[in-house]
Regions:
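Arginine/glycine-rich "motif VI" loop of SF2 helicases in the C-terminal RecA-like domain
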Residues: 19, 106-108, 136-137
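A glycine-rich helix N-cap at a beta->alpha junction
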Residues: 47-53, 59, 131-156
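C-terminal helix-cap and adjacent tail motif
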Residues: 66-67, 140-172
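Extracellular/periplasmic catalytic domains that process cell-envelope and extracellular macromolecules
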Residues: 72-75, 135
Length: 172
């Protein structure tokens, strides 16, 4: 993708509301296919280690990481990591709001986007923070791949809205 398109997405991301107007988000953009491939392999290796140590994963994830040909990033050309530059009670929520803005803008720009949650543990290791120049104290909160979709899949069915409580003041 052209840098102008990435800048459009990032500018949309930073328009998201933040608690106390702290604006904690910072971004890492990866468009190097070799780095993406190596990172994908490390993620699969780390998930396999977790499985051996007793941390169970869903059967679907187990099948994916056991497949040598599976690329965690689905061979997308661009990965954007949304990071918090510092930590407080609301920074994670702030970064997720930025992630949603980024994804909505990507969709409006005819791009496909997908959150890759499997990557978070690995990109937050010292090894990958060093490779990606993520400073000490910063934390990757979300990970989004972007690409040009071959097709637009139908919307997934959603569960009905579940309202736990609704209290209102009845005006007479």
């Amino acid at each position: 993708f052209r840098s102008e398109l990435i800048e459009l997405l990032l500018n949309a991301a930073i328009q998201a509301p933040t608690a106390m107007h702290e604006e904690p988000c910072a971004f890492v953009i990866i468009q190097d296919t070799q780095i993406l491939k190596t990172l994908s392999e490390d993620i699969k290796k780390n998930i396999r280690k977790q499985m051996v140590s007793g941390n169970s994963s869903s059967e679907h994830i187990v099948q994916l990481v056991e497949d040598d040909d599976f690329n965690v990033f689905y061979n997308a050309s661009t990965l954007i990591l949304i990071c918090s530059q510092f930590s407080n009670k609301f920074t994670s929520a702030d970064c997720w709001l930025a992630t949603e803005n980024l994804l909505l803008t990507a969709s409006a720009s005819q791009l496909g986007g997908c959150v890759i949650g499997l990557s978070i543990d690995t990109v937050n290791t010292k090894k990958w923070k060093d490779i990606l120049n993520i400073p000490t104290g910063a934390e990757v909160i979300s990970s989004v791949i972007l690409g040009i979709p071959k097709e637009t899949p139908p919307a997934s069915p959603r569960k009905q809205v579940k309202i736990l409580s609704w209290k209102s003041l009845a005006l007479n």
